[in-house]
Structure formats: structure tokens, C-alpha cells
Amino acid sequence: MSDESLRAVDIERTGTRHYAARNARGGVIEIGSGDGDTFTPVELFLAAIGACGAIDVDSITSKRADPTVFQVRVTGDKIRDDAGNRMENLAVDFTVTFPEGEAGDAARAMLDRSVQMSHDRLCTVSRTVEVGTPVASRLTT
């Protein structure tokens, strides 16, 4: 793969079971194991799926009208069994409304299609989950 396709974040331990993830642009997300107000890795996984879809749908529909409500809820079941830990039954639910009028009607007309386009083709995160890809875990020195 090329440098153009490479994406990366760096994660550093900040305390017992607490970490900070940083991107090249300076963004920081605090991550923890479920205590306090940090996100867990599973919550970040769900957030990544939802945010990816939200960005896709919003970028398509807001060209026509800004939404009056735009909410996304992502749910899934965390499974622990002999096959190991994983998520199942992932679902992304969009609640989106637009103002009355011609622009709002145009945005509403694109809503179903934009959600489907995000699911079928645009959202890198959910597409990667659905298609599947190996994850290499390596120890570096």
C-alpha cells in the first residue's frame, strides 16, 4: 500500500488501564476500561461505525437542507464464548428530520438512498467490518 492510503493513530498509556489515542492532526481521545467518563474500545468501535455513516448521510443530505434533528444510535451485543470476544447484531439507527419546504423535501427524498449508499459502499468503517480483513498484531522494539 502507498503512503497516501496509510492511516494511523498512536496510543499511549496515561495511567492504569487508561490511554490516549492521538492522530497526526493533534486530535486526542481518552480511552479506558469502563470506569470514569472515558470511552471503552468497544464504544469507540460503535462510535466509529456511527460517525462514519453520519458523515456520509449528512454530506449527501445537507447539500439540500440542514437537518433540524440528526442523531445516530449504534448498538450491538458483546459476545464472549469459546470463539473469543466479538460483537454481533450490529445496527445503526438514524433519526433525521428536515425543515418543511422545498429544500427539506429534497433532503428527505435523499435520506433512504444516502443511508443505503453509506452502508453499501461509502462508510469505510462498516464496510471493513462487513467485508472483513485480517488484523496483524506485532511486537516492535
Question: Where in the sequence are the language-model features?
Answer:
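Extended beta-strand/beta-hairpin segments
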Residues: 1-47, 57-141
